[in-house]
Amino acid sequence: EFMEKGIVRECEEELTEVCGRNPIILKVAEQAPRIIGLLVFRTNIQAVLCTLDMQILRTETIEFENHLTGEKLIQHAITLVDQMLECEKNILGIGIASIGPVDICNGVILNPPRFYGVRHVPIKEAIQEKYDLPVYFDHDNNCAALAEKLFGIGKAEEDFLLLAVSNGIGSGVVCGGEVFHSHRGFETELGHVSINCRGPQCSCGNRGC
């Protein structure tokens, strides 16, 4: 079916060291649809246009100004998707990864710490309505864990924990070869936990984070 749709093609490479008939090797076809990815950080939003085998064709970034709102965030996302569509119209879908906490089931960015002005943003619904394309939404660390499972050091592992350390601490869990999601659609989150109620005041307003 994928061959009929032009997504994959047979590779001419032959495996001569294998007993019996040579297996058919499939590769992503040159004319296969592309995919667009969006990554939401506290300071910027990034977009990438890539092939199905993860060859990056174009990247763009919009830095956030002061007084960011949910409406402005969605508009920035639309601007970036439009820029990607200038290069390629044949798009299979759009993936959105965001800092958390997020509501994965409903595609909503909830209330990330130190992400002032951004609360309960239905970014998945907004992008889906704008472009009429399949849209996938998840926590950024879950997406990172999936990338490690598919393309990185986790390919041979069925169970592992990804620990992301930047200006916060986050995690993604792969269990039984699949990214773990709770039944409520919320991600596993290690970051931004108060461990000393008498500690230094954090930018979130709590102490000892």
Language-model segment annotations:
Residues E1-R9:
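Basic amphipathic alpha-helical segments that dock to polyanions
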